[in-house]
Amino acid sequence: GGNELNVDYGGQSRRLMITVPKKLGRQGTHPVLFCFHGAGGKADGPSRRWSPHADKRGLIVISAEAVQPLAKWNFRDGFHAEEHDDVGFVLKVVEALISGKLADPGAVYATGHSSGGLFCYRLAKQTDVFAALSPMSCGMVKGAHDPDAKTTPVPILQVIGDQDKSFKGSSNPKVTMYSAARRMEVWRKFNQCAARPEITGQGEELEVHTFTSPSGMNVVLCKAKGQGHFLRSDLRDKADSLALDFLLKHRKS
């Protein structure tokens, strides 16, 4: 069922919408999916989108909300007019779920749209609690999101429309966003994946490029042909299912 929770963190009341599978607690811990809304959004939208998978996949689905009214995830320090420790907030929730014997510590995942997808790249770089992440319809910030010596290799699946403004990358005085191809290259190299991807189709309009390392680490680009920042609903549903398949096949050791 669904629950709404407000958590005090960093002097702010932070809103979570949590959907748990009917079998919660009967079979020990469960995989957890965090989902992050786009700029100006609320937790309700991603909750409606992802919560149906709670029972289907035995997942705890957590739709987190950025501090209102700005409602933008802190994907890079110094970018927004006001800043909040969103990374620390998410890590606190993960810690509580694991210590409460609800979350499987080897199966914590994240996805997000637009601003939420950018935030996923920050989590991929700065944290080591996620088994895999799937940023969607977003860019990746040059410098801020490049993995470094402190980053743990992690599987990533990027879903993006080839007509999305972020697909080809962008640059302005405040921020440079990598193209989809360039960010795949950055994470492919870091995860020690082969240079040549396996290319498969999910119907005519979804093209999947999978880069794999000898140890089985993946970096994947799911390109939605002819689609912009918001995928057509049937394609979005198909991409979401593909993303969940990808996420759940990975475990953090």
Q: Residue locations for each model-derived region?
A:
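A domain-start/cap signature at the N-terminus of enzymes
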Residues: 1-32, 56, 78, 82, ...
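Short substrate-entry loop that stabilizes the transition state in hydrolases
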Residues: 24-71, 142-143, 166-168, 230
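Cap/lid segment of the alpha/beta-hydrolase catalytic domain
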Residues: 65-85
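Alpha/beta-hydrolase active-site loop
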Residues: 79-101
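Short, proline-enriched alpha-helix->beta-strand connector loops that line the catalytic pocket
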Residues: 151-156, 215-219
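Short beta-strand/loop motif that positions the catalytic acidic residue
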Residues: 158-160
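Conserved alpha/beta-hydrolase "acid-adjacent" motif
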Residues: 165-179, 232
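Catalytic histidine-centered segment of alpha/beta-hydrolase-like enzymes
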Residues: 228-235
